[in-house]
């Protein structure tokens, strides 16, 4: 039995010899051959029968027939082992093939996983995009929903006028929705060679003053489409505002500009400008003036240096510093100022933060709350990380409401009689205020509507009570509408922007304007605003770059002054000692009214 077992081991090794590669298996086969020669012969015979190395199958078959019963029994055992050897080889091949298949499947699975992840991400992104699109569509639909029934009806009002029971027909008609919805461009007033930054009607509404980047001021007879006079403002950089002083016989214009100067122009009855003189100087750009409704000689100015000047033309030194706007001992540059028409002691300012500040000239104490009477801000912007600036604010006709336009945000209406920190009352959406210091205004004798320009080049008019967009007009081919000035008595609107002309609008269309393309424009404005809000970090980089450039300019400026033979040039007393470069440095990187021509 032991020899049979040995022969079996030997046959198995020989049968697998071609597959074996380990030295231990080969040495075990040699030891089996040294143990018994008979077994070695049998093993060799079996190897011949397995491999066929003896030359042919006949010899193998003859020897197998001449053996005894024991050998035949051994042959049976050897045959069974031979068959076992064949099965083990096939099994190993199958295992090897299976392992290769598994490896290939694993590799395919590994290759497939990133593809599946990308597909899942794409599907999630598509899902998010579709959700955002649906949300945007719902938001746009809510902003352009059906309007409520108008309060003023044309036919009943005309009938009442015929019967003499409506003494204020024109007054009420100017504030009617039906007229606003029929606004159409009447004509343009061409005379400037730069962006038009300011518009202002005189008290009677017969003249319209405009100021531009070309440093000129033009007074228009807007009905005849002709300039009454035009003159050099005396400013050294972009003219931001030019206003007729009330009750002055249209003979005095107050102006302010990017160079920080506040100047006054004296107009003669012979339709010429006698002279202009400087009455105040800010250390930064001055964007807005605030007139007192009945005063021909006093007004306020605000600048990016955070200073508010009160200017009285009757004084030898007209300007006196009224207040420096601060937030926790930090100065807040100002873009806008407006006097309350119902209480001229109060005025509101806005600028490089999110707060509307109201002051009372009789109660300004900078040691107590920095002199502020009260502040308003939309509550979601109080602690917001996004830098919200107020580009323009205005009081309503009776001073009870205050409208503020925020850059890359919406327009908010506050009740001016509410207590400090009160929430807004109304919110007006759809436009975009980012590229320039954009204006906002009330329209109508009772401030029935809100009107604003937009970076998309359109003019938006909202009904104040419902917050719905009721008019939508293309107002500027250059792309941005900055200034909107309602006529004091008629249903007429003057607008200007990056284009070099002034546009006059009146309700002369035969039917209400179709708000074609409004939804697409609103969607585009919303997407652009959302995209910009994701890149707030870039704002810090731009501020840092501006700071470095500002520092280098200052060093270069001081170095030039230290050079021998370089000194200040004599300047006219009416001119500003600061150059436009200095104005640029003071102004900072946040907002500009319009790029210089």
Curated annotation (Swiss-Prot):
Record SMART domains: WD40
Compartments it resides in: Nucleus; Cytoplasm
Biased composition (Polar residues): 1-24
Chain positions covered by the region annotation Disordered: 1-147, 558-597
Keyword Phosphoprotein in annotation: yes
Transmembrane intervals: none
Entry keyword DNA-binding: no
Positions of short motif Nuclear localization signal: 114-122
Start-end of Acidic residues biased regions: 100-112
Gene3D superfamilies noted in UniProt: YVTN repeat-like/Quinoprotein amine dehydrogenase
Location of the motif Nuclear export signal: 39-50
Record GO biological process: myotube cell development; protein ubiquitination
WD repeats, residue ranges: 191-230, 234-275, 281-321, 329-369, 385-424, 432-472, 476-515
Modified residues (Omega-N-methylarginine): 204
GO CC entries: Cul4-RING E3 ubiquitin ligase complex; cytoplasm; cytosol; mitochondrion; nucleoplasm; nucleus
Phosphoserine sites (modified residues): 21-22, 99, 129-130
Sorted UniProt keywords: Cytoplasm, Disease variant, Methylation, Neurodegeneration, Neuropathy, Nucleus, Phosphoprotein, Repeat, Ubl conjugation pathway, WD repeat
Listed pathway(s): Protein modification; protein ubiquitination
Bias type Basic and acidic residues, positions: 65-99, 124-137
Implicated disorder: Giant axonal neuropathy 2, autosomal dominant: An autosomal dominant peripheral axonal neuropathy characterized by onset of distal sensory impairment with lower extremity muscle weakness and atrophy after the second decade. Clinical features include foot deformities apparent in childhood, and cardiomyopathy in severely affected individuals. Sural nerve biopsy shows giant axonal swelling with neurofilament accumulation.
Main function: May function as a substrate receptor for CUL4-DDB1 E3 ubiquitin-protein ligase complex.
Subunit-level organization: Interacts with DDB1, CUL4A and CUL4B. Interacts with KPNA1, KPNB1 and XPO1.
Family (UniProt): Belongs to the WD repeat DCAF8 family.
PANTHER family noted in UniProt: DDB1- AND CUL4-ASSOCIATED FACTOR 8 (PTHR15574:SF57), WD REPEAT DOMAIN-CONTAINING FAMILY (PTHR15574)
Protein name, per record: DDB1- and CUL4-associated factor 8
Species of origin: Homo sapiens (Human)
Gene symbol of the encoding locus: DCAF8
